[in-house]
Amino acid sequence: MRSIRSFANDDRHVMAKHSIIYPSPEELEAVQNMVSTVESALKQVSDWIDEQKCTKIENGSPIKNESTEDSSAKDESGKVLCGVMRIGLVAKGLLIKDDMDLELVLLCKEKPSTRLLTTVAENLPLQIQKITEETFQVEQCVEESSLLIQSSKEPKLTLKVILSSPLFREEEERPGGVENVAMKDPPDLLDRQKCLNALASLRHAKWFQARANGLKSCVIVLRILRDLCNRVPTWAQLKGWPLELICEKAIGTCNRPLGAGEALRRVMECLAFGTLLPGGSGLHDPCEKEPTDALAYMTVKEREEITHSAQHALRLLAFGQIYKVLQMDPLPSNKPFQKYSWSNSDREGSCLKRPFDDGSSDEKDPNKKLKRNLSKILDSKPIDPNQPMNALMRLNQIRPGLQYKLLSQSGPVHAPVFTMSVDVDGTTHEASGPSKKTAKLYVTVKVLQAMGYPTGFDTDLECLSSDEKSDSEGKNETSFSSSSNITGNSNADNNTLEVRTQGPILTASGKNPVMELNEKRRGLKYELISESGGSHDKRFIMEVEVDAQKFKGAGPNKKVAKASAALAALEKLFSGPNAVNNKKKKIIPQTKGVVSTAVSAAVQAARGRGRVAMARGAFVGATAAAAPGYIAPGMRREEMHPEIFNGYAAPYAYSAATPAYGIPKRMVLLPVMKFPAYPVPHYSFF
């Protein structure tokens, strides 16, 4: 299946060709004026004929009775000319330049005769003069059962008025085709087949207005194919009613609206499939009661030639050469990513391809082939810091074609350090990071800062893991401090923080905010509150509840928004005067020895990865649950704390967590003791 972009390119070419072949507003206005004038004049002619008929009846029968009055009323109710209807291109809206055939059908009560045609032709110019000052030439064409009306002003238009009657159709539908004896045809009756064709055209116009006019791109494709039929002799036999049926079937059977380019391709597919060939599906005429083939007039050779031409056109469409099918010049490439319009001086003399450079120039810049005149544009258009692009994208706009080089890779396998460099105007900038992408981003920010551009860009670091983000600051010599990395504000009312940074979001201690908050309050749940913006500028808001308080964070992706929410919670609850009161509360169960509390703290310190558990004392409550403690063998309780343990002996080296005499329930116990030199076991009892 072709991509949407190729269909969009086809749409551009089809619509450009359609604008070329579509009539000008002056031509459409002239068509409307001419058709409206002739319709009004024919109505005046109908009234004049009825008046003449009534006058003859009155002169032929001066004595009137009730029966004659009734008959005259019936004659007045049934006029000689019943009405005028638009058919063909005017009714269907398929007019194109150099192909503006205007047709009307004048319906008569009785079968039209040559005498009636002459009467209308003689009186029509007189009625036209009463309506408009413009002159029209009216010619009588008995062979075609019609009148030809030509305009005298530019553009030159020709309107064909065909006389017909519904009696021809009724006569065809009668069994045997026997006409009523009382109704005899006039001797100068007009051509029967021409009148039947006019009635068929009237049915075609009504069917087209009901079925094809509502289909998207159907009328546009029909105008394009009508132009193709005029240009290519092979397609001339398909012009008209069969072409309209094929387009309606091809476009109407799709389960979704089609663009102009895709609709044209679908019609070509139906023709290339072999619909017209003998033994194919054929083309049924929906406006006939009996099964009728709309392609019965075409020969086998003509069908094969049209099928072959459609197959060739379909190949051209598949290879993006629709301009050859339409016989037009290819349109210039329409690049959606080009956001800036070039000036007239830059546009003149420019070509689609990059000019050939033989290297004879004295410039020593290796990137001269890739540079563009963006410096003038950036000087005229200041950089918007709110634009959703990171530092790498912005530097690529300012200086396209920069070459980033990997200088070195150091560190262990599990924690490598990459050093990237870039040369800008003879100055080499270097930066390190835990990955090539991060190092490249850091050196880009460094270059932008050196050039004096603001660096408050949104950066998408989805590919970086949280561990990589938290470790990168400790390993990178050129990493920025937390005060320069984090540019945001926390609101005390709604506890919302939005961080805009070019690197990973870190706390003051150099850790990931989510990890540090998880150390202080485990089991937190982050929820997505809202998601806004388009596909190129997303905005996510995450919320987390800590100690019955809700904190929100916003960012270009969920990970950044989550880190922003965690950072807001840390700044509100664990910074400044609230840091001591809101530290993580580890409830130590009641043990059978004070030594066990200290030993357990030491064990926790030995197990943790640099997390010193002895930084604060363990809170011992009076309601704590009992748990066993650990006492090194060979040590007596009385030797460690005789002021506490004397008189409170317990079997199996267990003792109470607190002495018998009263002490505060929330007292912090800081025992002074000597720990054994041998290793502490790697387990704890809480």
UniProtKB/Swiss-Prot annotation:
Residues 477-491 have a biased composition (Low complexity). It comes from the Eukaryota. GO terms for molecular function: DNA binding; double-stranded RNA binding; single-stranded RNA binding. GO terms for biological process: cell differentiation; spermatogenesis. One of its GO terms (cellular component) is cytoplasm. Residues 387-453, 509-575 form the DRBM domain. The keyword Isomerase does not apply. SUPFAM superfamilies: dsRNA-binding domain-like (SSF54768). It holds the Pfam family DZF_N. Keywords: Cytoplasm, Developmental protein, Differentiation, DNA-binding, Repeat, RNA-binding, Spermatogenesis. Residues 345-368, 466-476 have a biased composition (Basic and acidic residues). SMART domains: DSRM, DZF. It is found in: Cytoplasm. The keyword Repeat applies. Residues 339-368, 464-498 are annotated as: Disordered. Residues 5-360 form the DZF domain. May be involved in spermatogenesis and sperm function. Binds to double-stranded DNA and RNA. This is Spermatid perinuclear RNA-binding protein.
